[in-house]
């Protein structure tokens, strides 16, 4: 008997159907010689700092850095039932070995490792490594299970990535939050990404547009241009000299050019194209692609390869044929030309997973049953697959130079000789319909035939006004491209470059920036908020450096290959934390008030953000924190007292405050006591009292005392 553990229930069901585990049990599927169970994504995660020491429950700068000696993992509260099922199965005497069937990648290794380690199991582990959930792929994968030892370095990289993110996130966020009295979220990857948004926004806001002029000659219908003349008088003089005069062709250059078909999709290029064509966010595209994968309609989406392996040649031909049949391509596509599959095959360019293509399940699928986004993304992948294996786009480009009054004007035109893959690109221009645009409708920039020495008489000259343009704000498309190549110029040519994040994590990074209110979407644009701009301004360069973060990603890749040790990578992360705290020590008191726009009464004991007064309470300014001191809280109301500003400020400062004129209904007397406040990590507040050694007062005693004090004043 063996146990298969997948990442999600849907994947478990697909595997169970193939290996014959059809009997439903509580949290798993049972077969004659196997069991199939599942996680719910990250079933376990690293614990929060207070699990190592209760003092970390409160955010204090002097407690930093927080660096666990022995890392602890805990199960998410809402997933404990499934974990205990897995733990029981992993330690069952019936089970001889375990198959790790979590997603074939870095995160899949981490998900399985956490569960396996927490369970205490010592069962041998094998690895199912597949790029498709088709029955044939699962069956082949199960018949050729790999040793878990093959993926030891991948698991090490997964652990280091997760621990590095924890260390940077926890320490940097607490350091800058407690220094600036405002919740400031800092991340190993998200902060350099934010810095790119802020840099682009600065380039746009600081841009000074300049006016320039083009002078254009009409040479018997051929527009010949002298561009970018910044002096208006010079431009007008040139126009005036040329208008009505003759122009002579001094050079004609005809060049045949070929444009190769785009490569197959990896996740990043799919996300970029879906954003450009459909306006989908990176996360929407990833979620949709994952759904199509689980429905067995496309191959594994979280890939960084744009090639297929050489043993997939016949599969690729069959898939292309199936795409033609499924989408009933008409007109010039009645007979699919033999796809050039060789151009998309390269074993050296495929590591964990090959490029994203449809599966043969496309043949039996019902497209009308798919959700709108699923239908669009499947269509995008299908047509792009055909496009990538199509002929080159070939055109003839003609460049001419025309001399008029001693100045050279240039014109350019082209004639398409072979549409090739561009024919399929028209599908995307017609994105709302599953049809191919007639190529005859495509505009072709033709130029009349001209010869060197040809003269144009009485040409018309026109001056047109233009302005230089600022850089465009990032869209999800261009931001993903920038993240993918960030820091690459710092590396040698032979260095494997990974940029900021990975294809699987970039969508989440963008969403986190928006959730943290450091960035916002405006149509297709992604713009930094004012808080995002200030955060980037206050952080040291190394925390927002794209090249440093890209270097970390490269080191993780080297670790996957077994070329560097985990200790080497983690030492670098810890050294960076030390450097960060040294910089924080030097922050001036005046600088720490940068985010403060109104008077606060103190700092939150839970997260260190500023606390402000409202009509009903004193609340933490961090929207993720639930700490609040209510003016009419039940504890004080029971003693006929309300929380005022002075009391709240003292509690925030010292954790206790001496309170007079508290009333006990039971004993019908007033008394005074020290009010103590305790908080937990959720922001829940508990009050308690301690009593100074003073004589209690009744209501009558209080009245007499007040009268006596009044007399003494006079």
Feature locations, PLM:
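Glycine- and acidic
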Residues: 1, 68-72, 93-99, 178-180, ...
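Basic, low-complexity terminal or inter-domain segments flanking catalytic cores
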Residues: 2-3, 79, 90, 173, ...
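Metal- or metallocofactor-binding catalytic centers and their adjacent structured scaffolds
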Residues: 232-265, 271, 547
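C-terminal or mid-to-C-terminal helical accessory/interaction module adjacent to the motor/catalytic core
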Residues: 93, 137-219, 254-258
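Intrinsically disordered, low-complexity regulatory segments
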Residues: 1-162, 339, 433-434, 470
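Amphipathic alpha-helical transducer elements in NTP-driven molecular machines
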Residues: 9-16, 33-36, 40, 76-87, ...
């Amino acid at each position: 008997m063996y146990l298969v553990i997948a990442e999600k229930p849907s994947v478990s069901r697909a595997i169970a159907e193939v290996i014959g585990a059809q009997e439903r049990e509580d949290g798993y599927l049972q077969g004659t010689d196997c069991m199939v169970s599942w996680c719910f994504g990250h079933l376990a995660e690293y614990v929060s700092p207070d699990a190592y020491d209760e003092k970390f429950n409160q955010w204090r700068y002097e407690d930093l850095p927080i660096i666990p000696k022995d890392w602890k993992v805990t199960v998410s509260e809402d997933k404990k039932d499934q974990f205990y099922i897995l733990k029981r199965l992993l330690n069952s005497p019936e089970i001889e070995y375990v198959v790790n069937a979590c997603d074939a990648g870095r995160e899949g290794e981490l998900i399985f490792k956490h569960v396996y380690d927490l369970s205490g199991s010592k069962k041998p582990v094998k690895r199912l490594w597949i790029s498709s959930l088709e029955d044939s792929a699962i069956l082949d994968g199960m018949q050729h299970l790999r040793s878990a030892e093959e993926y030891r370095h991948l698991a090490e990289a997964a652990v280091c990535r997760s621990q590095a993110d924890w260390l940077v996130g926890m320490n940097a966020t607490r350091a800058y939050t407690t220094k600036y009295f405002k919740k400031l979220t800092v991340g190993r990857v998200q902060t350099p990404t934010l810095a790119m948004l802020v840099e682009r926004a600065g380039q746009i806001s600081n841009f000074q547009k300049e006016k320039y002029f083009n002078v254009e000659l009409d040479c018997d219908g051929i527009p010949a241009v002298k561009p970018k003349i910044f002096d208006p008088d010079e431009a007008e003089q040139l126009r005036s000299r040329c208008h009505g005069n003759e122009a002579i062709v001094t050079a004609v250059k005809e060049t045949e050019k070929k444009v190769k078909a785009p490569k197959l999709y990896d996740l990043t290029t799919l996300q970029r194209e879906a954003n450009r064509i459909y306006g989908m966010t990176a996360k929407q595209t990833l979620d949709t692609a994952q759904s199509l994968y689980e429905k067995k309609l496309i191959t594994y989406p979280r890939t960084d390869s744009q090639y297929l392996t050489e043993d997939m040649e016949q599969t690729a031909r069959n898939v292309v044929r199936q795409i033609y049949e499924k989408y009933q391509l008409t007109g010039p596509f009645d007979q699919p030309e033999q796809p050039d599959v060789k151009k998309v095959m390269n074993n050296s360019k495929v590591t964990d997973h090959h490029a994203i293509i449809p599966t043969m399940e496309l043949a039996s699928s019902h497209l009308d049953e798919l959700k709108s986004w699923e239908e669009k993304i499947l269509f995008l992948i299908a047509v792009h697959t055909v496009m990538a294996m199509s002929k080159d786009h070939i055109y003839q480009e003609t460049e001419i130079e025309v001399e008029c009054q001693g100045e050279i004007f240039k014109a350019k035109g082209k004639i398409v000789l072979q549409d090739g893959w561009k024919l399929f690109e028209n599908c995307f221009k017609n994105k709302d319909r599953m049809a191919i645009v007639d190529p005859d409708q495509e505009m072709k920039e033709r130029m009349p035939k001209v010869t060197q020495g040809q003269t144009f008489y009485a040409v018309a000259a026109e001056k047109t006004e233009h302005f230089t343009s600022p850089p465009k704000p990032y869209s999800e498309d261009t931001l993903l491209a920038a993240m993918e190549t960030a820091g690459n110029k710092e590396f040698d040519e032979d260095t494997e470059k990974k940029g900021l994040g990975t294809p699987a994590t970039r969508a989440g990074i963008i969403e986190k920036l928006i959730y943290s209110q450091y960035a916002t979407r405006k149509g297709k644009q992604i713009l930094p908020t004012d808080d995002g701009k200030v955060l980037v301004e206050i952080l040291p360069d190394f925390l927002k450096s794209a090249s440093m973060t890209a270097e970390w990603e490269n080191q993780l890749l080297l670790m996957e290959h077994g070329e560097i040790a985990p200790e080497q990578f983690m030492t670098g992360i810890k050294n960076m934390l030390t450097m960060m705290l040294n910089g924080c020590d030097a922050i001036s008191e005046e600088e720490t008030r940068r985010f403060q726009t109104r008077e606060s009464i103190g700092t939150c004991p839970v997260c260190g953000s500023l606390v402000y007064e409202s009509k009903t309470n004193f609340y933490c300014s961090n929207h993720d924190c639930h700490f609040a001191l209510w003016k009419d809280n039940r504890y004080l109301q029971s003693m006929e007292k309300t929380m005022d500003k002075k009391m709240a400020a003292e509690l925030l400062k010292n954790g206790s405050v001496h309170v007079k004129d508290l009333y006990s209904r039971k004993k019908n007397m007033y008394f005074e006591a020290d009010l103590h406040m305790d908080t937990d990590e959720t922001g829940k507040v508990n009050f308690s009292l301690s009593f100074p050694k003073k004589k209690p007062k009744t209501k009558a005693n209080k009245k007499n005392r007040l009268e006596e004090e009044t007399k003494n004043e006079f």
